[in-house]
Amino acid sequence: MRRELIFLVGFMGVGKSTVGALLAVRLGWEFIDLDQEIEKTHSQSIREIFEHQGELQFRRMETEALQNLKQRVRCVVALGGGAFADENNRSLIRDMGYSFFLDCPLEIIMNRCPIDLSRPLFKNRPQLQELLALRLPHYQTSDYRIEISNLTPEGIVDRIAEQMADWYSGSSEHLGNERSGA
C-alpha cells in the first residue's frame, strides 16, 4: 500500500510550489519543494548545478532526493518539471504516493514564464515547446490530471482535497482508476 505522499507534477510555471504549500497547510502535512531540497543539500542553486555539473548530474541528485523521501509520510512534494520524465523517478513516486498532473495550456505557461535565462532548460519559445512535448507523455501517466487553466491555486487545492476525501471515504476502490480531475 502506498504511503500518504502527494506529488505535484507538471511543467515549470504551473504553480506546483504555490499549490503544494497551500495543500500542505490545508492537510496539516509537511511541504517539500524538491528543487529547494536539492539546493539545500548541495549548497548550490539549480542553475549553478546545471552550469558546473551538467543536467545528468542534476538528474542523479533529483533521484537521490526522491529516494530520501522513502521513509516520509504525510508530505506534499512539488517536483521539478523534469523529475517525472525519468522512468526510475516515476517508479519511486508510484511506490511512495500519488501523483497529480497540473495540466495547463502552453500559452498560459508562456505568460507565466517569460524567457528567463536563469532557468537552465528554458531559453526561448521553441525550446519550451520542444521540452513540453517531450515531457507531456510522462506527465499524462500521473495518477490524476487536473486541468488548471481556469482555477486559482485555492481551486486546485480544492480539487485535490476532494479527490483525497473520496479515497478516505472509501468511494474510490483504487486510486488511479480515474485519471481526470477536470
Predicted regions and their residues:
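ATP-dependent small-molecule kinase phosphotransfer cores
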Residues: L34-R94, H138
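NTP-dependent small-molecule kinase module
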Residues: M1-R2, L22, R26, R72, ...
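ATP-binding Walker
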Residues: V14
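A glycine- and Lys/Arg-enriched "phosphate-lid" helix/loop adjacent to the NTP-binding pocket
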Residues: D95-P137
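Walker A/P-loop
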Residues: S17
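P-loop (Walker A) phosphate-binding loop of NTP-binding proteins
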Residues: F11
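Hydrophobic anchor at the beta1->P-loop junction of P-loop NTPases
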Residues: L8
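Post-Walker A helix-loop "phosphate-sensing" segment adjacent to the P-loop in P-loop NTPases
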Residues: V25-Q36
